[in-house]
């Protein structure tokens, strides 16, 4: 490999902050201003060395061509019924954004209802959330530009796809809930702020409000229905009960799976919605999560983790709501996690469980909770579902590492309740029968058994010679279940690779216990679990350190950066996407304050002691041994990322280049690429996705000397 001449970057040694008596220097704090000329010059100088490096990777062209070819397969969502019509999303293959179609019947001709591709030339305007009125005649839809979390809500009459004049701004992390009379909709907005709000600003998001918009009026006339002036971090999302009588308000403070639950009986508002609603505080603490499923009169069914870390179903009668009076409808499973529940055909409940990171789907009786049927599923994930209380049918979508998607339809009016394949998609050019997926359980440092999926070509020799791509996340109660990824399958097929996904602690794979095992004081467990996954792959002969790439995004970017700092000898290549790198300051920007439930906050002395031990920015050091250098590193971020603001990766790369990159023994590249008109990832246009994965895998191939296999 070659040694690099990195840009000269100014270090402000006077930028020192006192944390509980510890003086911490932050020499690149000036990079926190995204609009300064200095920051723009830094980004330009970094991109100037990174872009040519990526473009000169011998396989980039081959990879991009193959990705474009194989990703060109049809992508469907489940059909869903609204009013008298059916709707579904469909992407012909390489469209930048998926398109919403409408049909008068399942067999009827499909017409375009909403095509986000017409809203920008480069595909960077994306649909972010939508909600149909109860009768299906109107749809509200959110649009986001350049990947920002900020949303503009517009409205359309479905008949004739006619756009209305109503426009809602200042919207972010919002609910969209119509009242059943179709007159208007609840949504969330933030107060006006100084300066811009286009996703390139870093100002913090506080004081979210719940508003009600009456169709056909100006946003300035919208009605304030709930606010929490004493609790700036609270966010309250509304939904309507199935019968339309109750507004349920779910209040969250951070990312923990806990919420308060207030409700308003609209029958107690004789003049309609005219101001702050008469909220009844059913649950007024953050000691559990309460997810509304359905109700019969005043008896409400909730999915909860209160005293049940794997979740259960309970009934609460609003006329007799004491906790001692709650009834268990479906008890907690000792091992499997209840992920979601839906009520359908008025008397059935569909329950989706996670069993050892694989989904199972069941039908239960709503009155008794009894199991009626288990739907047959291969090993994989349920990634789509539709079917509401008044529907008599359900659709569900299955995917796995080797199957792009099968949509099933089940008519619940039929005696035998047999699902049929409604749509199945195949990808030309990758024959699933050539590959195999195995799930293993490896021991972590403390002996905990961690699940990991491994995908590879059948019949490979486990001689340590294969390039491997290890992915992890490990946070926020999010489970990483099997999914179909063309870009990773190309790595397996054309780069002779082994794909591994480690289901480390911090995620939700085994309920709230698994989540709590990888947060706050236990965060190091995530890093240990991931490093032990790498050691397992090496020990079993799948790969060797010099052939191993680790990858993660967001909280997973934090994961791989920390692992590079802690064990630079264990990996050949690290790709960190939109990572959280400055653990002492993350809470000060946009929505970062919500993550303190997983990470803690440096304002607290005890939390500071945890964070300073692993914060990627504060733990970069040149390895002592002469024969150990940092792995090749590529950090990816974007100018409109207002979730993990793009100051994290620039500060981290500047630190890496300064402390490590100037050493004679550091021949592996330490690079960053900052994309423009892009954000944290949601709604990213297909064209940008293809460029990004081509960069990633070209970087891996160049750094690890991997040849292309035709």
From Swiss-Prot:
Gene Ontology CC terms, in alphabetical order = cytoplasm; cytosol
Give residues where N6-acetyllysine occurs: 157
Check the record and name the SUPFAM superfamilies matching this protein: alpha/beta-Hydrolases, Peptidase/esterase 'gauge' domain
Main subcellular location of this protein, as a coarse class: cytoplasm
Q: Where in the cell is it found?
A: Cytoplasm
Q: Report the superkingdom from the record.
A: Eukaryota
Give an example GO molecular function: oligopeptidase activity
UniProt keyword list: Acetylation, Cytoplasm, Hydrolase, Protease, Serine protease
Function description: Cleaves peptide bonds on the C-terminal side of prolyl residues within peptides that are up to approximately 30 amino acids long.
Family membership, please give it: Belongs to the peptidase S9A family.
- Which PANTHER family does this one have? PROLYL ENDOPEPTIDASE
Know the name of this protein?
A: Prolyl endopeptidase
Q: Which organism is it from?
A: Bos taurus (Bovine)
Q: Which gene encodes it?
A: PREP
């Amino acid at each position: 490999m070659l040694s690099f001449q990195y840009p000269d970057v100014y270090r402000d040694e006077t930028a020192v902050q006192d944390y509980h008596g510890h003086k911490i220097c932050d020499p690149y704090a000036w990079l926190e201003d995204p609009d300064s000329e200095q920051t723009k010059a830094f980004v330009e100088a970094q991109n100037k060395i990174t872009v040519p490096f990526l473009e000169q990777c011998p396989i980039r062209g081959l990879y991009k061509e193959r990705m474009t070819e194989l990703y060109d397969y049809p992508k469907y969502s489940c059909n869903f019924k609204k009013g008298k019509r059916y709707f579904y999303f469909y992407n012909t293959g390489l469209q930048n954004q998926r398109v919403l179609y409408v049909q008068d019947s399942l067999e009827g001709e499909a017409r375009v209802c909403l095509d986000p591709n017409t809203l920008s030339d480069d595909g960077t305007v994306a649909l972010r959330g939508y909600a149909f009125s109860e009768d299906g005649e109107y749809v509200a839809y959110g649009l986001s530009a350049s990947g920002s979390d900020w949303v503009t809500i517009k409205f359309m009459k479905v008949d004739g796809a006619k756009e209305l004049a109503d426009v809602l701004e200042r919207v972010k992390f919002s609910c969209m809930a119509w009242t059943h009379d179709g007159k208007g909709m609840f949504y969330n907005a933030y107060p006006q702020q100084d300066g811009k709000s286009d996703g390139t600003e870093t100002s913090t998001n506080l004081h979210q409000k719940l508003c009600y918009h009456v169709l056909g009026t100006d946003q300035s006339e919208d009605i304030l229905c709930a606010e929490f002036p004493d609790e700036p971090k609270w966010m309250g999302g509304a939904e309507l009960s199935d019968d339309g009588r109750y507004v349920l308000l779910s209040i969250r403070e951070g990312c923990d799976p806990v919420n308060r639950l207030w409700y308003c009986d609209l029958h107690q508002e004789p003049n309609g919605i005219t101001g702050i609603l008469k909220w009844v505080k059913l649950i007024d603490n953050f000691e559990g999560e309460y997810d509304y499923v359905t109700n019969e009169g005043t008896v409400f069914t909730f999915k909860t983790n209160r005293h049940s870390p794997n979740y259960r179903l309970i009934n609460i009668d609003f006329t007799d709501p004491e906790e001692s009076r709650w009834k268990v409808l479906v008890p907690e499973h000792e091992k499997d996690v209840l992920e979601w529940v839906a009520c359908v055909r008025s008397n059935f409940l569909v329950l989706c469980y996670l069993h050892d990171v694989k989904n199972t789907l069941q039908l239960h009786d709503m009155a008794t909770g009894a199991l009626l049927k288990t739907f047959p599923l291969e090993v994989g994930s349920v990634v789509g579902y539709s079917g509401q209380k008044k529907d008599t049918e359900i659709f569900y979508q299955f995917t796995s590492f080797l199957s792009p998607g099968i949509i099933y339809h089940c008519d619940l009016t039929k005696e035998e309740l047999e699902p049929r394949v409604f749509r199945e998609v195949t990808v030309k050019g990758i024959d699933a029968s050539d590959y195999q997926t195995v799930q293993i359980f490896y021991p972590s440092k403390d002996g905990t058994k961690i699940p990991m999926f491994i995908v590879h070509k059948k019949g490979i020799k486990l001689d340590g010679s294969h390039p491997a791509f290890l992915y992890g996340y490990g946070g926020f109660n999010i489970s990483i279940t099997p999914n179909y990824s063309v870009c990773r399958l190309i790595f397996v097929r054309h780069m002779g690779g082994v794909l591994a996904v480690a289901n480390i602690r911090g995620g939700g794979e085994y309920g709230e216990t698994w989540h709590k095992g990888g947060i706050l004081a236990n965060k190091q467990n995530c890093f240990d679990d991931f490093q032990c996954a790498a050691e397992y792959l090496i020990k079993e002969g799948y790969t060797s350190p010099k052939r191993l790439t680790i990858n993660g995004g967001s909280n997973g970017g934090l994961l791989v950066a920390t692992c590079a700092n802690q064990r630079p000898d264990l990996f050949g290549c690290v790709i960190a996407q939109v990572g959280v790198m400055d653990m002492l300051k993350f809470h000060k920007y946009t929505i970062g304050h919500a993550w303190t439930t997983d990470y803690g906050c440096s304002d607290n002395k005890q939390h500071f002691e945890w964070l300073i031990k692993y914060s990627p920015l504060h733990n970069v050091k040149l390895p002592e041994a002469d024969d150990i250098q940092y792995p090749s590193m590529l950090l990816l971020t974007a100018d409109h990322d207002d979730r993990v603001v793009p100051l994290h990766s620039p500060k981290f790369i500047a630190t890496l280049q300064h402390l490590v990159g100037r050493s004679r023994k550091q021949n592996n590249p330490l690079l960053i690429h900052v994309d423009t008109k892009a954000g944290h990832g949601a709604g990213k246009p297909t064209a940008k996705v293809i460029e990004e994965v081509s960069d990633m895998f070209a970087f891996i191939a160049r750094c690890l000397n991997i040849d292309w296999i035709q």
